[in-house]
Amino acid sequence: MAKSIPKTGSRKNVRIGSRNQTRKIPKGIIHVQASFNNTIVTITDVRGRVISWSSAGTCGFKGTRRGTPFAAQTAAGNAIRTVSDQGMQRAEIMIKGPGLGRDAALRAIRRSGILLNFIRDVTPMPHNGCRSPKKRRV
């Protein structure tokens, strides 16, 4: 059986909007998730739509080096560089996790020149929920 040829104006062939829209974003939210193994920095607008993100792994760090403060600093600087070109001037910071990259990422964000409204720690804390895993014996 012969394959059907799609129409030129069909919905599947037409791209509705360009993916990399450069829109002006004056204010945003910077989410820093710092685990012991990696640090992920996500920048969203105030409605929660992701504008830019970066992690220590995407910046070229592999293995245990991803959990270092320097890797977190590099990831934060990499994510902020793209949004500062789009005109972001003010931001709120949400920091989550116990990792080493918390302070280093915050230091890199402060140095970038973006004005910070507030810094909030949103690390989830259990109110005696699930039993925690047993301690490692090395």
From Swiss-Prot:
<dbReference type="GO" id="GO:1990904">
    <property type="term" value="C:ribonucleoprotein complex"/>
</dbReference>
<dbReference type="Pfam" id="PF00411">
    <property type="entry name" value="Ribosomal_S11"/>
</dbReference>
<protein>
    <recommendedName>
        <fullName>Small ribosomal subunit protein uS11c</fullName>
    </recommendedName>
</protein>
<comment type="similarity">
    <text>Belongs to the universal ribosomal protein uS11 family.</text>
</comment>
<dbReference type="GO" id="GO:0019843">
    <property type="term" value="F:rRNA binding"/>
</dbReference>
<keyword id="KW-0699">rRNA-binding</keyword>
<dbReference type="InterPro" id="IPR001971">
    <property type="entry name" value="Ribosomal_uS11"/>
</dbReference>
<comment type="subunit">
    <text>Part of the 30S ribosomal subunit.</text>
</comment>
<dbReference type="GO" id="GO:0006412">
    <property type="term" value="P:translation"/>
</dbReference>
<keyword id="KW-0934">Plastid</keyword>
<keyword id="KW-0687">Ribonucleoprotein</keyword>
<dbReference type="GO" id="GO:0003735">
    <property type="term" value="F:structural constituent of ribosome"/>
</dbReference>
<dbReference type="GO" id="GO:0005840">
    <property type="term" value="C:ribosome"/>
</dbReference>
<feature type="region of interest" description="Disordered">
    <location>
        <begin position="1"/>
        <end position="22"/>
    </location>
</feature>
<dbReference type="InterPro" id="IPR019981">
    <property type="entry name" value="Ribosomal_uS11_bac-type"/>
</dbReference>
<keyword id="KW-0694">RNA-binding</keyword>
<dbReference type="InterPro" id="IPR036967">
    <property type="entry name" value="Ribosomal_uS11_sf"/>
</dbReference>
<dbReference type="InterPro" id="IPR018102">
    <property type="entry name" value="Ribosomal_uS11_CS"/>
</dbReference>
<keyword id="KW-0150">Chloroplast</keyword>
<dbReference type="GO" id="GO:0009507">
    <property type="term" value="C:chloroplast"/>
</dbReference>
<keyword id="KW-0689">Ribosomal protein</keyword>
